[in-house]
């Protein structure tokens, strides 16, 4: 049986909810990156033993969170020894906006996987782009590179008024 690890960072809990669903569907172990961008003890060993690594992060300012990027930069050690070569990779992300530049985050994950000589697996779920489609339909956002979700926020403190 294959061993799958879902490594993710979650800023406000939305990505954690996605990670839990992904892990349940893939019969995978969860590996959370903490608020300082670090893995828990034994985390690197979990990834070394995995056959597949599924990466998740919120999309902030058009890319993965800095905590995920810190993890990615630290993965240069397994890169140097080619420890993740031929592993299967996939990814998921979310943002508050309908678009939110989530594809940029998935491209970031893809590039990281390719640098590790991995094999990328996208989504085979057809987009729900019919007139009858609803926002909760599978693949409403139409992504083939990986899973995308829109995470609603309750309130924003941003003031978009512009005084000239």
Where are the predicted features?
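Glycine-rich phosphate/pyrophosphate-binding loop and the adjoining helix
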Residues: 41-43, 124-164
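Generic structural "secondary-structure junction" signal
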Residues: 62-63, 81, 86, 94, ...
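Short, glycine-/small-residue-rich phosphate/pyrophosphate-handling segment
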Residues: 88-140
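N-terminal beta1-alpha1-beta2 submodule of the flavodoxin-like/Rossmannoid cofactor-binding fold
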Residues: 1-84, 156-162
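Short glycine/serine/threonine-biased micro-segments
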Residues: 11, 50, 54, 60, ...
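Soluble or luminal CAZymes and related metallo-dependent hydrolases
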Residues: 67, 101, 105, 163-164
């Amino acid at each position: 049986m294959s061993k799958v690890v879902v490594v993710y960072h979650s800023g406000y809990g939305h990505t954690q909810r996605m990670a839990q669903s992904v892990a349940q569907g893939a019969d995978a172990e969860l590996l959370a990156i903490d608020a300082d961008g670090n893995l828990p003890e034994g985390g690197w060993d979990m990834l070394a033993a995995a056959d597949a690594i599924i990466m998740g992060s919120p999309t902030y300012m058009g890319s993965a969170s800095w905590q995920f990027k810190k993890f990615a930069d630290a993965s240069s050690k397994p890169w140097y020894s080619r420890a993740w070569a031929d592993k299967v990779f996939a990814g998921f992300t979310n943002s508050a906006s309908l678009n939110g530049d989530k594809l940029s985050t998935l491209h970031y994950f893809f590039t990281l996987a390719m640098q590790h000589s991995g094999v990328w697996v996208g989504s085979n779920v057809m987009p729900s782009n019919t007139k009858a489609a609803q926002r909760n339909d599978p693949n409403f956002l139409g992504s083939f590179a990986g899973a995308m979700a829109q995470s609603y926020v309750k309130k924003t403190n941003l003031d978009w008024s512009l005084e000239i």
